Amino acid sequence: MNNTTRLVLAATVCVALGACTKKVKEVPPADQGPATTPGATTGGIPDSTPGRYSPSDLETDSCLRQRVIYFDFDQDTLRPEFQAAIACHAKYLRDRPAARMNMEGNADERGTREYNLGLGERRGNAVSAAVQGSGGAASQISVISYGEERPTCADSSEECWSKNRRVEIVYTVK
């Protein structure tokens, strides 16, 4: 990688991390209801850092809802438009050490079964490396390839094939 590419990649990661910050509004305490203890669990993932992402944010936070990363034909290189989402998922993992994610790599139907399984794995590894590069821990990430076995679209057209060239980020609880 030449220096210009590294500089552009570093700038993209910095912008992506800045885009994932969450504004926290100060709310005065209204009623002293039942207290929650630090480290209490919500959905199996410890809620150890108040004011940061919680498991419910996986459904409500727009950058965390982006859980499908698409790829170009026969490529395992990440597109720039997915860098912000990847940085957001990395931040979630940093804030939640008990969280785990699977990178499920997929390919379209073109190519042999073996080739597509390898391509799906390379794509999953590319997303995993990007998440780790943004601060996610390798111990929190698993990669599995389904190759062409789990298409989201069954037509034989470029539009359909482009939907099948993907990595799905699936959160699990250990």
Language-model features: locations:
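Short beta-alpha junctions and helix-cap segments that line functional grooves
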Residues: 153-157
